[in-house]
Amino acid sequence: MNARFLIVPFLAAAVSCAGVHFSESDGLPPIRPDYIGVTIPEGIAPLQMEMADGRECSYTSERIGDTLYFTVSAWQKGSREGIRYAPFPVYVSHDPIDPYLAYRLIEPGYESWREMGLYSRELASYKEKAIVTNSAVGGACVNCHNFPGGDPSRMMFHVRGAGGGTVFAKDGMLRLLNLTTVGPHRQGVYPAWHPSGRYIAFASNSIQQSFPISGTQQVEVYDHWSDIILYDVGTDSVTVYPPLFEASRNETFPTWSPDGSSLFFCCADSVADVAADRVRVRYRLQRIDFRDGSFVGDPHTVWESDSISVSHPRVSGKWLLFTASRYGTFPIWHREADLWLLDLETGEARPAAELNSEESESFHNWSSGGRWLVFSSRRLDGRYTRLFLAHFDGEGHFSKPFLLPQKAMSHNDLRLKSYNVPEFVRSAPGQYDAQVRKLYGR
């Protein structure tokens, strides 16, 4: 990314301020999205912004070394007087970032939806393409997408409902498997593809909902029971390992270590009435060894707290990021849910204050190089999850997060869907609607 590339989109905006006299201000502009002082990857789509108070604005940029300096001028529509604010920096990092994101778009409801789908977004532009939409499966739910190591030549996703199952894509070819017809006859969610590509760990759970009649939380989602199952892609077989299939414990959110030698997951002691005792249910982070296609030994606790429930662990090198909430296993509906960073070498964990807000932070994933993070947050309005990116220095510190760039802020205001389960992908994923229709005989 260079200054010339950035300035071109802004020149047209500057024309509209002709004839306006600007007084200089030492203050920084109240813009949205808040890009002041963020770190962006080289080559990302141009940052577009507007005044948070609705005033007209124009802006220019100048690059000095690896810093972009934006100067914003603002005025009331029809006025001949305006303010030119002090320049603010945007830092450019040369740390590589995977060129695509994959995510699900869905209305933030409880039971119903109209349209949903899995989509990819090119980070160097604003281009978004459908991987598969639920129109290809008669309006059923499509979810739980996963790519092995961000490799778009292989992926999987679930289709819920009558005739549903798990769809596997490999080199552009699709096949359908119903996990409940093999092994222990259990469905699977929250997939985690082993680095070798041979195995997929799933949580197999009974998901329930309750609707509190007091307080501000609209819905509570919880597991009545949950276990870990292992699918062998090579043999189409599903196995269970007794220590991960205990009725006295609920295991969920599997994720592999980078070398595939162990599986991290979240575990809580079972309670008889989860709906009534949900505030007592707190998940701890556990780990179990994995060798030659099998789990080995008993799991051990990596981190736990009597006041925090752990969910969505993701590992990069010696660092593990998880979502922390007061209780439970579905933090997206918990306003207090924050991201925490755990040093696996020291066992010390801290809130990732650089990333967190007053609203819920939940799903997150590392880039393949471990220097970038994508996560979902409801910080803009408390209802819809949007995607934010942040740089990681490799020493335990994140930069200020920034909203995924769009052509205009109105895109975020008018798109009444939530971004769900973001994942970095190393190149453009396929588009499978036509093949999925054929697979389902539509």
Q: What kind of region is each of these model predictions?
A:
Residues 7-16:
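Bacterial N-terminal signal peptides
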Residues 17-442:
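Sequence signature of WD/YWTD-type beta-propeller architectures
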Residues 1-6:
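Bacterial N-terminal signal peptides that target proteins for export
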